[in-house]
Regions:
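DNA-processing P-loop NTPase/helicase core
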Residues: 46, 111-113, 118-167
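P-loop NTPase Walker
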Residues: 1-130
Length: 167
């Protein structure tokens, strides 16, 4: 990908057991290894609280493992390298992994991996504030699932990458 065409959105959809957590963690880690402060500009959305917790734990533990050269993180390190420029040294990867880990742990509220429900709730709360509707706005989760299931289910069998480019 050239510097003129930077991906603003990457969307992965896949069935259970297909490696979504691994894939998302690798991509997230690659982004923050490239630029450690970018964690503040990344949003990962999952369907369940369990998936959210697993994703956060995986990213933090792999940043630690990569940064400290732990053998159990070698599969992540090799995949992360695929998304980094060739001139990115192993030492730079280690240093930036630890730097990103430190940034995230010291600014955890900006480590944005959340469920689709909490994402929509936050968006609606912001919209309500902008429209001066007060804080009584609530998201009805059953309705949200009825809305999102028909959208996401038909393409839930393969990983799809969608790119929106800056001209």
């Amino acid at each position: 990908m050239t510097k003129q065409k930077q991906s603003l959105l990457t969307l992965y959809k896949a069935s259970a057991g297909s490696g979504k957590t691994f894939t998302l963690a690798v991509r997230y880690i690659a982004m923050v290894v490239r630029e450690p402060s970018d964690y503040r500009h990344i949003l990962a959305v999952t369907f369940t609280n369990k998936a959210t917790a697993e994703m956060k734990q995986r990213i933090l533990s792999q940043l630690y493992g990569i940064g400290n050269g732990l053998p159990e993180s070698s599969s992540y390190l090799e995949k992360v390298k695929e998304f980094l420029p060739d001139n990115f040294s192993d030492n730079s990867i280690k240093v930036n992994a630890l730097k990103a880990l430190n940034f995230i742990l010291n600014d955890y509220s900006h480590f944005r991996i959340e469920t689709i429900d909490s994402f929509f709730q936050r968006v609606l709360n912001g919209l309500a504030r902008e429209l001066q509707l007060g804080s009584g706005l609530a998201l009805e989760l059953a309705s949200l699932h009825q809305f999102t299931t028909p959208i996401f289910t038909p393409i839930d069998t393969s990983i799809v990458e969608v790119h929106h480019y800056n001209p």
